[in-house]
Amino acid sequence: EPVTVPEPECYTSYSHPLPTADGRIIALKEDFDRPSAFVLIDTVERSERRITYTGDVSTRPALSPSGRLWWTEYRRSPLYAEKVASQLCYMDIESGKPKIIRKQRNALYPTPIREHGIAWVEYTYDGSYSVVVNGPLDLDRHNTIPYGKEVHGMAWDNLTDRLYLLITDDDGMHIARLTKEGLKRVTEPAYLTLSDLTARDGKLYYGSIASGRDELHSFDLATGREYQLSTSRFGSFDPSAVNDTLLLATTYDQRGYMPATQRIAFERVVEPTKIPQKMLLPKVKDWD
C-alpha cells in the first residue's frame, strides 16, 4: 500500500524508508530539481519535512533506537579529485546537525547494535573487507573477512544479538553470520542478487530476485525457512520492519520510486534454488 506523500512536481525517487519510534518515516528523497535529502514523513498529517541535504549516499542508512541516523557518503579528496572515499556520517534527527567522522574512511553499511554501539564495514582498494565493531564490550574491534569475499550488506538482529552480512564469492551470493570464529553460512550460495539487508526479532529482511524480479523476502533464523513477502508489478525494494506484521519498502509507479507498506505474511515459502526463475527472459529452444 502506498504511503501518502506530497504530490511530486517532477520525477521523484524515495528510497530506504525507515520507521521512527513515534510512527513517522525517514526516507532519502531525490528529484530533478533539488539535491538528495533525508525527509521526515508524517503519515497522519500527510506532511513532509526536510531533515538535511546529503551528498552522494554510498550505502543504505540506518536508524538507532535513540533516534540517531547513520549513513555513508562518497567524498572527494580536497587534494586529488580522482581520489574518492566513503565516509561515515550521522545526525540526531530532532536536534542535531549532520556530522562526518573524518578519521573513518572507506566505511560502508553503518549498523547500530546493542547498547548504543555501532558497527560498519571497511574496505581497502585491493578488495579486502573487515567489520569494525564499537560497543560497550568491544572498542574498534576489527573482524577480517577472508580475501575473495565481498560484503554487500550488513544488519544486526536484536533477538540473536548477531551481525549478518550479504556475501559474494566464487560460489555466488549468500547470507552469513559473523561469529568470533569468523563467518558462518546462514543460506546456501546461489547466483541470485540479494540486497538491502535488515533484521528484527529473529528475522532477516532483504530484496531477492529468486522469483525473476525484485521482491521482498524474509528469512526466519529459528526455522531456517525463506519466504517471499511481496508480489509487485515492477518490483519492491529496501525492506525495513516496523513491527511483526508490517514492513516499510520502496515500490515503483508512474511518479517514480515511492515509499510503501507491505503486510508481513509468512505464507509463500521459497525453496532453495541456484538461479532465478526465467520470468522476464524470452523463450528459447534448448540446444541439441
Model-inferred region functions:
Residues E9-T12, K29-V39, T52-T59, T72-C89, ...:
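A flexible loop/linker signature enriched in serine peptidases of the S9 family
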Residues D22-R24, S66-G67, E115-H116, L159-D161, ...:
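Short coil/turn segments that connect the beta-strands within blades of beta-propeller domains
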Residues P2-P8, S47-T52, G96-R102, L139-I145, ...:
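A short beta-strand motif characteristic of beta-propeller blades
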